[in-house]
Amino acid sequence: MNIFNQLKQDIIAASRQLYNNQEIANIVTIETSKDNFNGDLSSNIAMIIAAKENMPPRTVALKFKEILITLPYIASIEIAGPGFINFTIKAESWQIAIKNILQHEGKFFEIDIDKNKYINIEYVSANPTGPMHIGHARGAVYGDVLARILQKVGYNVTKEYYVNDAGSQINDLVSTVLLRYREALGEKITIPVGLYPGEYLIPVGQILVKEYGNKLLVMDEEERFKIVKNFAVEKMLDLNRKDLEELGIKHDLFFSEQSLHDKGKIEEIVKLLTNMGLIYEGTLPAPKGKIHAKWDNRVQKLFKSTKYGDSQDRPIEKADGSWSYFASDLAYAKDKIDRGANHLIYVLGADHSGYVKRIEAIVKALGKEQIKVDVKICQLVNFIENGVPVKMSKRLGNFASVQDVNHEVGKDIIRFMMLTRQNDKPLDFDLVKVKEQSRENPIFYVQYAHVRTVSILSKAMELMPESYSSFEAGIYDLSLLSSEEEIDIIKLLAAWTKTLEVSAKYFEPHRIALYLINLASKFHSIWNFGKENSDYRFVIENNKELTTARLALAKAIQKVIASGFEVIGVEPMNKM
């Protein structure tokens, strides 16, 4: 029995019995109380019904109390504030969560959620102009773990990387690679400001020399550009793929922006929107703070995005007549929808916060009100080494690459640490701190908890084989787990699937990391109590029954930590 789902279903049943209400399943909530003074769980059902029935919330709450107090797992019910219903759950109903985790793992981790969604989640999408810096890793980990969570709760998910291979930065990449090519042929070169001075492009120039000799120098400029562009983008994309794979990240699809141009997808969407009266020729006001004398107030083709809540209409052509980046966005969104997605999630960097309304406008303009759009912004990572901030810039050639940091600390540390703060808050990544073996290092703290559970079970197998055999056979008395600390950690274990559900609902993977830190903290507290008071130890040589029950608790903690690590993409450690 999942106590959260069970209580929700019983509340829904009571609502139908009292008010014949058939529509509350998706709006009733079950929350964990913040302290033991307000029970274990609470619900807003009375206020929902009161608003619909035009009744005082407390009156409604009392009616629910009369029915729900008869449930076998409810110890008491209190009505608080304007009509919150607070439930205290019987200890044995919490304790059974241990049995469910150990013996019915599949059912315990099953989540009751609407699964009729086909989600396309786009993340990373770093320009293929060089190695990925550590700032990209945050969006990469956030997107990857969010996709894992959504898949775990049952959604169909496509993980996508949008390859920006058609913009001005690609032109700069080609120019830089051509200079490195000339350098490989023996010329002395200088990399102009605005290009990419990093040494990572030197091997690309050298490979071009091996394949083409000096033929590129005498080749038609257009043909040379095409060859070098395709070659450079492929090499940089291979570099990015490798960086991502070393972080444990694999996309289902790498989608080329250039393919939208080559296949006429942009012309197709522009024609469609023009026929709908959503493309017009006009001018845009100068940006705030812009010197108007320098503002290009030209007539251009604009998309009526303000009709759908955007702050201004968006140009679909550049001054030179080529398609704008936004025009590609239009075609790309339509392509995703045409492929069957009914929920689009975009994971973007802090410099793309203005894209939220634009993307929503695109989908609405396509007449796809049923398509849900979410844009999640990942704030900056402040990378620190020995207390000194490290500036990150491909163009300056001095940035902390994902590869460098991965080789320094490992993928597991990067993945976990990137989730220790909510995605829309800045994150400090301290290279020294993440390698410390202390409570101040969250990943170490959780891994150490897993290691200790392994140690407990190994010690019991050696010192108390009879207790261990009983535990292995599933013969244990969970009612012996009755201390306040034990019940407290069991409640947290029971809330694991609820944490997954909420993380999926609000697109907040950081909840998983924080949950694991909290679980580890409670476990370490019990362990430390055992150092001072032998009654709190997991293995008590003169108490077979209690030891057997606590082995079950230790194993349940181990399984939930491992489940959390699986979602985050971290390998649990068995020894340190």
Curated annotation (Swiss-Prot):
Catalytic activity as recorded in UniProt: tRNA(Arg) + L-arginine + ATP = L-arginyl-tRNA(Arg) + AMP + diphosphate
Under CDD domains, the record lists: ArgRS_core (cd00671)
Q: What PROSITE patterns does its record include? A: AA_TRNA_LIGASE_I
Q: Which residues form the signal peptide?
A: none
Kindly report the protein's main subcellular placement as a broad class.
Answer: cytoplasm
State a single Gene Ontology molecular function: ATP binding
**What SMART domains does this protein's entry cite?**
Arg_tRNA_synt_N (SM01016), DALR_1 (SM00836)
Q: Which UniProt keywords apply?
A: Aminoacyl-tRNA synthetase, ATP-binding, Cytoplasm, Ligase, Nucleotide-binding, Protein biosynthesis
Give the top-rank taxon of the lineage listed in the UniProt record for this protein: Bacteria
One BP annotation, GO: arginyl-tRNA aminoacylation
| Enzyme class per UniProt | ligase
Catalytic activity, EC: 6.1.1.19
Q: Where is this motif: 'HIGH' region?
A: 126-136
- Cell location: Cytoplasm
- GO CC: one term? cytoplasm
Q: How does it assemble?
A: Monomer.
Query: What family does this chain come from, according to its entry?
Result: Belongs to the class-I aminoacyl-tRNA synthetase family.
Q: Provide the protein name.
A: Arginine--tRNA ligase
